[in-house]
Amino acid sequence: MSAYAELHCLSNFSFQRGASSAAELFARAARLGYRALAITDECSLAGIVRAWQAAREYRVKLLVGSEIRLEQGPKLVLLAEDLAGYQQLCRLITRGRRRADKGSYRLLREDLQPALDGVLAIWLAEPGDDDDAAWLGECFPQRLWLGVELHRGADDDARLRGLLALAARAQLPAVACGDVHMHCRGRRALQDCMTAIRNHLPVSEAGAHLFANGERHLRPLAALQGIYPEALLAETLRIAERCRFDLEQLKYQYPRELVPAGHDPASWLRRLTEKGIRRRWPDGASAKVREQIEKELKLISELGYESYFLTVQDIVGFARRQKILCQGRGSAANSAVCFALGITELDPERINLLFERFLSRERNEPPDIDVDFEHERREEVIQYVFNRYGRQRAALTAVVSTYHGAGAVRDVAKALGLPPDQVDALANCCGRWSDRAPSAERLMEAGFDPQSAVLRRVLALTGELVGFPRHLSQHPGGFVISEQPLDTLVPVENASMVERTVIQWDKDDLDAVGLLKVDVLALGMLSALRRSFDLLHELRGGERLSLASIPSEDPATYAMISRADTIGVFQIESRAQMAMLPRLRPEKFYDLVIQVAIVRPGPIQGDMVHPYLRRRNGEEPVAYPSVELEKVFERTLGVPLFQEQVMELAIVAADYSPGEADELRRSMAAWKRHGGLEHHRERLTRGMLANGYEADFAARIFEQIKGFGSYGFPESHAASFALLTYASSWLKRHEPAAFACALINSWPMGFYSPDQLLQDARRHAIQTRPVDVRHSRWDCSLEPIGQEQPAIRLGLRMIRGFREEDARRIEQARQAQSFTDVHDLGRRAGLDTRALELLADAGALRGLAGHRHKARWAIAGVEPQLPLFAEGPRIEEPAISLPLPSRGEELLSDYALLGTTLGPHPLKLLRVQLKARRCRASRELVGMEHGRPVRIAGLVVGRQRPQTASGVTFITLEDEFGMVNVVVWHDLAERQRRPFLESRLLQVEGTLESSSGVRHVIAGRLQDLTPLLTGLDVRSRDFH
């Protein structure tokens, strides 16, 4: 036998069944000389795009198929013979998946009728299963085979005879199949482990579910010849020959119904663009902008993407009609057409951007437009898309959730029978998202013997499992919308969320096969900005503030930013950003663009940050390698900071076409994962030498490009974000009460909890008023104080566990008449005992019943009343004298119920004890010189570990005077893991570092002082 085609093979997209990736399977199939390989994951095409890419790489023909089992029916392998067969297969999988909950399927006999044209079927029967033969023959006339799967079992000879006899009785051709679950025999242990995981059993108890041997791998041709009759092997090639379908045959069209009569997509897009030009530039667009728009419209028309732009414009138009704040970002911000259509907010007159980063002729790939919407109202936009286009033509893309270190080791350890306490301890040795095996030192610290055979087996299998698909989840908002039913392109299944459906491919798969998507994303800052505008309009009336009407280039705003007074400000509120601000000292909008981008892995790893700062501060001359490149790098003082600059450099210095430059960008983004950047070294060097640049300069540029790795930040993305950075900064500087109030009402979002946001507001002299049923709404609100900044009234939403519907009833009853006492409140607002107890414990009844102790006593006599007796007389009881709660009791209750306090900061109450420990307050660090040893203590506000920090973690501590940034090196974090991860009140001994107005403490020793809090519930925001 010179060739063979495997017709039944599962990849690791048959979750917890297949033990090899498509790339591993096709690489081995190529080495073994297979003619073709079918990927037949169970009721799924989730992995088929990756299989298609692997098949092209290894030059082995891909057969597209799926394994299914009918409810109370036979098991089949279905293969797509042609495009019609592929579409039938997609529809069948969709029916089975939509009928069942996420992660499962139900296919019935009637789903195979009428006949599935273009689908070949292999019946995986047992000897003697004659009953289904005639029925299956009707379902698949001339397209049905009997599959013979032999795995060197003791009964192989009898099984072969029985199956051949069944084939003869049913008048069906027989064909060899492998039921392949792994590319090589060495994966058997992993396959056994995955089977145990799938069945929630340890391997030692999973015997009935495990395969008898390791034969379900891709076997050499010689081995197959010794197992199967030649005719059965030859039949595999005949079936492979009949399967002519290739994913390249898919024809995708974007919806066209948005175009009114009398127009085609091109003319309607031009009409809307012209309308947008008049709105964006009332005095007329410049010749430069006009030229750019004409260039873009011509290319959009040439590539046939008009309907895509119209669809995105329609979605954004809906949001604006509903007063939902939104903004396009990413590469779409490079487009003047997108700005004219209202999709993006970045004026091409304001910043010079590169359209080819978004769309190019050479790249021949669809554009990708990301639009951010208010996070609290995005669901309205998502349901609009579903309703406008229907479930048949719109669905979210999937995200392939993969195994990472802690999750993988937990599943493997359970499967190998480790007791629960050891499973937890071992998982804790691994970072949640880290894929590296824990060090021997870390294992020993946790009580494990690194030389233990069982432990080594667990870690070895974990290493194989890491990176495997675990399940499909839904993309946060990536929509695929089609002119034709989506299930003719890809199977569609239910998402875990109600009223959501997802396709089985993720965003990377879409790029490979040319499907367009629009990202309907959520951004908390947009919610906060809209809430700020609402609060100010309610407070003062007049013309409503908007993003467009915020005064630009305000010196007071930039002065605040340069002081790093940016808690709550979009993109520049992290400790790393705040440490950079006094060094960079932004003075204009483009400085903010750089600030947003510079504290990123790309510039840091490419060693671009310090040269830029030195040049900006006049400590190093600004130099350019040529006059031509001065135009490229002038805006960043000769230092490449953005992806677009790398593209422009390649175009100007090495004669790349715009499309080739974008291919360089894509290679740059993927080289750490897939390699593929080296071929650009020779191309860049050759082009730069030909244009008169020095070889060492070309080499240095290439190393900087590698430094960008997968983290190079797009200028368009930074510029879009900088718009929101400036808007939020302006609000914090000029309307701090409204901004803080809006942030709290929009929480969870950002780096800081409501407690830290309120502490910051108080440091800015903003008055904060307590939760009070006589005044509080559900949301926090503003209360005027003469000409000063208004006070923030805490809302009932601050009370942990309090229901919004109860708050709405309180508001409604209060509008009719003020409450006279607790009984009146409970009766007219219809509050149950639980709601009243929460209000009492939160101090929200102080105005009706007194302090917390009195309020608790008062509600003890409130009984829910039937309507018949609602207006009856009430017996008055004599007042009871109850003691005032102590300051400590008040503090504990505040944090337990509200997560914050309007009383003294917790550390103010502990300051005497902290002084006894020789801990300095944060304000004492201001006057101290660089290099001094210090001891500090504070509440842990958050822990951050940037991707570029080589294991460094930044811990933010807060005391009654402010915040301190603490740097914890990896070794210290490992040595003192418990106080590092678990402390809520942390003492740090270390060394003060001070430079350019930035201070932080390099930790040398950590100590957990949490017991001093005596039950105080203070929560940090960690690793988000």
Swiss-Prot record:
<dbReference type="Pfam" id="PF17657">
    <property type="entry name" value="DNA_pol3_finger"/>
</dbReference>
<protein>
    <recommendedName>
        <fullName>Error-prone DNA polymerase</fullName>
        <ecNumber>2.7.7.7</ecNumber>
    </recommendedName>
</protein>
<keyword id="KW-0227">DNA damage</keyword>
<dbReference type="GO" id="GO:0005737">
    <property type="term" value="C:cytoplasm"/>
</dbReference>
<dbReference type="Pfam" id="PF14579">
    <property type="entry name" value="HHH_6"/>
</dbReference>
<dbReference type="GO" id="GO:0003887">
    <property type="term" value="F:DNA-directed DNA polymerase activity"/>
</dbReference>
<dbReference type="InterPro" id="IPR016195">
    <property type="entry name" value="Pol/histidinol_Pase-like"/>
</dbReference>
<dbReference type="InterPro" id="IPR011708">
    <property type="entry name" value="DNA_pol3_alpha_NTPase_dom"/>
</dbReference>
<keyword id="KW-0239">DNA-directed DNA polymerase</keyword>
<dbReference type="InterPro" id="IPR023073">
    <property type="entry name" value="DnaE2"/>
</dbReference>
<comment type="function">
    <text>DNA polymerase involved in damage-induced mutagenesis and translesion synthesis (TLS). It is not the major replicative DNA polymerase.</text>
</comment>
<dbReference type="Pfam" id="PF07733">
    <property type="entry name" value="DNA_pol3_alpha"/>
</dbReference>
<keyword id="KW-0234">DNA repair</keyword>
<dbReference type="InterPro" id="IPR004805">
    <property type="entry name" value="DnaE2/DnaE/PolC"/>
</dbReference>
<dbReference type="InterPro" id="IPR003141">
    <property type="entry name" value="Pol/His_phosphatase_N"/>
</dbReference>
<dbReference type="InterPro" id="IPR004013">
    <property type="entry name" value="PHP_dom"/>
</dbReference>
<dbReference type="InterPro" id="IPR040982">
    <property type="entry name" value="DNA_pol3_finger"/>
</dbReference>
<dbReference type="InterPro" id="IPR004365">
    <property type="entry name" value="NA-bd_OB_tRNA"/>
</dbReference>
<dbReference type="GO" id="GO:0008408">
    <property type="term" value="F:3'-5' exonuclease activity"/>
</dbReference>
<dbReference type="Pfam" id="PF01336">
    <property type="entry name" value="tRNA_anti-codon"/>
</dbReference>
<keyword id="KW-0235">DNA replication</keyword>
<comment type="similarity">
    <text>Belongs to the DNA polymerase type-C family. DnaE2 subfamily.</text>
</comment>
<dbReference type="InterPro" id="IPR029460">
    <property type="entry name" value="DNAPol_HHH"/>
</dbReference>
<dbReference type="GO" id="GO:0003676">
    <property type="term" value="F:nucleic acid binding"/>
</dbReference>
<dbReference type="GO" id="GO:0006260">
    <property type="term" value="P:DNA replication"/>
</dbReference>
<keyword id="KW-0963">Cytoplasm</keyword>
<dbReference type="GO" id="GO:0006281">
    <property type="term" value="P:DNA repair"/>
</dbReference>
<dbReference type="Pfam" id="PF02811">
    <property type="entry name" value="PHP"/>
</dbReference>
<keyword id="KW-0548">Nucleotidyltransferase</keyword>
<keyword id="KW-0808">Transferase</keyword>
